[in-house]
Amino acid sequence: DLVRSRGLGDVYKRQAPKNCIFTTNTSYMLASMFAEDSGRPEKFCAFHFHDVFYSRVVDIMPHPHTDPTLIPILEDLGRKLNQVPVLVKRENPGYIFNTMLMALIGAAGKLLTGEVASVEDIDRSWMVNFHMQMGPFGILDSIGLDTAWHVTHNMTDRASVAFAALLKTYIDQGKLGEKTGEGFYKYPNPAYRNPDFIV
């Protein structure tokens, strides 16, 4: 939420020491959108963690006015936190991995809303072909359907609009994925974790 982020920036810039580096963990808002509000845009950079229980990647994404000397400092911090730092050289909503992930999720959503295949068969196809433990809909349940909806509901292409509408029906029923016990699958024992899911 951009307004809330701007309000926090006012508090931080008054209380933080002058040499303090400000970072944001936002997933889709660009640091340049609120860098000026930090009061120190040259000391502001995106430092984005993925789910630390599953991933060790931290994205470092400077905005055009970030002091380049911050990059090695943040890379070193990432390594000290047992993360693998990746540098996003140009601002991009979704960084690197989330951009690729949303392409996968978008394709899976298009297949489902176009009635090309079922949730289970879309996931099976992905899991078998790439030797993965879950497919796109299992991933969506892990991310949270509400989170996925926040990303997709402003997209304007026909497939994204249809998929956002489908996600909203789940959200309206309180089915947000793994965190609520049900999304595209039921938890704690979703079908894709059963040995007979892929036969």
Report residues per predicted region.
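Histidine-centered active-site/metal-ligand motif
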Residues: 1, 48, 132
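Rossmann-fold dinucleotide-binding core
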Residues: 20-89
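Helix-to-beta-strand junctions that scaffold the AdoMet/dcAdoMet cofactor pocket
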Residues: 16-17
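Structural/interface elements that position substrates and couple domains in central-metabolism enzymes
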Residues: 97, 101-107
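Single conserved hydrophobic/aromatic residue that forms the stacking wall/gate
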Residues: 1-12
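Conserved short loop/turn motifs at secondary-structure junctions
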Residues: 92-95
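Short phosphate-engaging motifs
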Residues: 30, 104, 147
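NAD(P)-dependent Rossmann-like dehydrogenase/reductase catalytic/cofactor-binding core
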Residues: 69-73, 79-90, 109, 113-114, ...
